[in-house]
Amino acid sequence: MIDALYNGGLNLVAQSWWTGAVWPVLWNLLKIVAIVAPLMGAVAYLTLWERKLLGFMQVRHGPNRVGPFGLLQPLADGLKLLTKEIIQPAAASKGLFVLGPVMAIMPALAAWVAIPFGPDVALANVNAGLLLIMAITSIEVYGVIIAGWASNSKYAFLGALRASAQMVSYEIAMGFCFLVVIMVSGSMNLTQIVLSQAQGTMANAGLSFLSWNWLPLLPIFIVYLISGVAETNRHPFDVVEGEAEIVAGHMVEYSGMGFAIFFLAEYASMWLVSILGVTMFLGGWLSPVAALDFIPGWIWLGLKTFLVVSMFIWIRATFPRFRYDQIMRLGWKIFIPVTLVWLLIVGGWLLSPWNIWK
């Protein structure tokens, strides 16, 4: 579908060599806007949904003053942050201080280029899409480190050090989760990973949700979800910005839009981790049962992603913050050994007569 739109636009401007040469660049800009604009809207309203859901879980009202049912609260928050003065510490490294937030949010937005929204709907149908996303998202930690170092604050620097150690630790476990999914799917292409989950005895019987990867790879799915919470520095793994000890971590010296960009990067990463988990383990745009195939795939993808994101919020409302040593122990002594063992189990499973992914 994306290719058809591109070719149609190219034919319209082909009469002029100048517009024909400009069209590919313009098309890429249009695709970027088509992803970034809705994503920023989803990120803004995720903050409202989080506050509403936390309010419900704590038996209180969430934001309900700005607009009907508080629906304009994200716009009010954004306007407030836009009007705040941006203050740089006198001893901060000026250029790097500005670069930090940009480096934090760019990977969270750029990784969406390889996410498929349907069998023929992806900005870039990359054969090594999963590898590309891993490479892009691994850059995000540099934004945090740069912000912590450039702030010239001991609290910010301590938060940056914690962030780098935590994100690198859980990236290893997530990498092994990706490797297991690649093994059972036989591809790093995210579209092919989704299509591989539409095969099998249960899918043929109309119960597609029982053929998705979450069931045979349940331990890997659980490790991925918890590692995703840690990767996005969400509660209970938010010691990077632990309010009770290091104030706001690497963001302590930021105000106005600098702080807002870090905030947006965190929530954009939540959406990315959620939709990636849905793509790898929950069938992507596939309907759970054949009787519901008439519902468009993008609705299923959005609904599943919304449920996974809501799980992030439920975890925040339920669990206390872990100590830093507990977080490191969980990553290195539990998740990495578990994923390595399951890597061997799945390898043997694929070579056995009981291989269900044939």
UniProtKB/Swiss-Prot annotation:
The keyword Cytoplasm does not apply. The keyword Cytoplasm does not apply. Keywords: Cell inner membrane, Cell membrane, Membrane, NAD, Quinone, Translocase, Transmembrane, Transmembrane helix, Ubiquinone. GO terms for molecular function: NADH dehydrogenase activity; oxidoreductase activity, acting on NAD(P)H, quinone or similar compound as acceptor; quinone binding. One of its GO terms (biological process) is aerobic respiration. The chain crosses the membrane at residues 29-49, 95-115, 130-150, 167-187, 209-229, 258-278, 295-315, 334-354. It holds the Pfam family NADHdh. It is found in: Cell inner membrane. One of its GO terms (cellular component) is plasma membrane. Its EC number is 7.1.1.-. It catalyses: a quinone + NADH + 5 H(+)(in) = a quinol + NAD(+) + 4 H(+)(out). It is a multi-pass membrane protein. NDH-1 shuttles electrons from NADH, via FMN and iron-sulfur (Fe-S) centers, to quinones in the respiratory chain. The immediate electron acceptor for the enzyme in this species is believed to be ubiquinone. Couples the redox reaction to proton translocation (for every two electrons transferred, four hydrogen ions are translocated across the cytoplasmic membrane), and thus conserves the redox energy in a proton gradient. This subunit may bind ubiquinone. PANTHER family: NADH DEHYDROGENASE SUBUNIT 1, NADH-UBIQUINONE OXIDOREDUCTASE CHAIN 1. HAMAP family: NDH1_NuoH. NDH-1 is composed of 14 different subunits. Subunits NuoA, H, J, K, L, M, N constitute the membrane sector of the complex. Belongs to the complex I subunit 1 family. This is NADH-quinone oxidoreductase subunit H. It comes from Paracidovorax citrulli (strain AAC00-1).
